[in-house]
Amino acid sequence: LPTSFQDEEGDTGLRIAFDFDGVVAGDEAEKKFQSEGMKAFQQEEIDKKMQPLQAGPLQSLFSKLSQLQKLDAERGKDDPYYEPAIRIAVVTSRGAPSEQRLITTLKSFGMYAAELFLLDGMPKKPILNVLKPHIFFDDQLKHLQENTIPSVLIPFGINSK
């Protein structure tokens, strides 16, 4: 999507942000939420908190970037002044009590995010404006339209219809 994003001079790190459901993970939880409402969604997430969600369309990309992030963190672990070369964030509308299934899913894929923002339905824009990712991936246009950061719509699943 068009943007007026300007990278800061001297900024050497790469920041990438992902939505979770319908992007990193499949959209089975989103389908439950849209078809049966918040209460049914939350109960299912509690009941299945130890069962990972299916992979989403960008799971492979997220996983590979996560491995690079781990290698980079290992490289700088003994240097207190080390600036990470890559930082991955998950910025999701999820909140309590559905966070455990998100964590279970990330662990099952062997993935790691440097930052995890569980917004519990709050707007993503304020977090993204502070985080300033170089790119943000989301499956819902409403989360991207007012952003001033480079964003990519992932047309996947129930939200692409």
Explain the meaning of each model-derived region.
Residues 9-12, 17-118:
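Alpha-helical substrate-recognition element adjacent to the catalytic core
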Residues 1-16, 20-47, 129-130, 135, ...:
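Asp-based, Mg2+/Mn2+-dependent phosphohydrolase catalytic module
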